[in-house]
Amino acid sequence: MTSQTPSLSFEVFPPNPAVGNEKILRALEDMQGLAPHFISVTASNNKYNIKETTVPLADHIQNDLAIPTIAHLPAIYLGKEKVAETLRDLDAVGVHRILALRGDIIPGVEPLKDFKYATDLIEFIKEEAPQFDIIGACYPEGHPDSPNQISDIQNLKKKVDAGCSSLVTQLFFDNERFYDFQDKCTLAGIDVPIHAGIMPILNRNQALRLLKTCENIHLPRKFRAILDKYEHDPESLRAAGLAYAIDQIVDLVTQDVAGVHLYTMNNAETARHIHGATHSLFKHHSQVSAL
């Protein structure tokens, strides 16, 4: 372990274009005051055009708010020409950090063949646009499509060797599983920073979606007890969910995690609450220039 001060970063997502940007822009103004190390902007591989959603929002965060920005790029349904176009769009607005993703496969929709794996995308970006810093995704409890964790970590090593400078994890609720994953990465020769993805569970609907979509994620007994006890008590569930996330973060920082990436769900109040409880543990984004 190292004694380097960890970073705190946020993830946001572009709203439905029909809804408009007013709410997310207000949330981002609030988040700006929290001085995150960076903000990542998600991209959908099936709903909205990246050029019309992710790129403008990343541009605003990077240039208007002066916060280092990472743009997500899921490529399974994009051909090389479309990826190259997206890279040009991001380059034009000075956003040079990308979270390179395969992207989720949509049932009944045939993927394109250019980027079957995230590694294919990473290699393409390194060849076509070497000015970009590439971040990879990783899964402490194994990718749902991997036969086992050994295979998953072998594939992760390929990502890093292809050009990832750092990694961000899928959300998890059991820190011990994250530490075990870190140890296995070290044994596999993966030596880039790994940022731990943390999502506070704040309401019943969010919890139900999680249980349905993230079947590979272990829910510790303490976490399940929160869901069971406060399922029909929204105020207490929110308070307990925030407390659980804060406990996770304090433990991670104690164990010298490289960084914590907070899945904010565009909720500035959540980001502010967690920042208020933990900000002294983290470094300000102006203190450093890279992940």
What is the meaning of each model-derived region?
Residues 2-41:
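Conserved N-terminal beta1-alpha1 strand-loop-helix module at the mouth
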Residues 11, 39, 90, 159, ...:
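Conserved, mostly hydrophobic/aromatic
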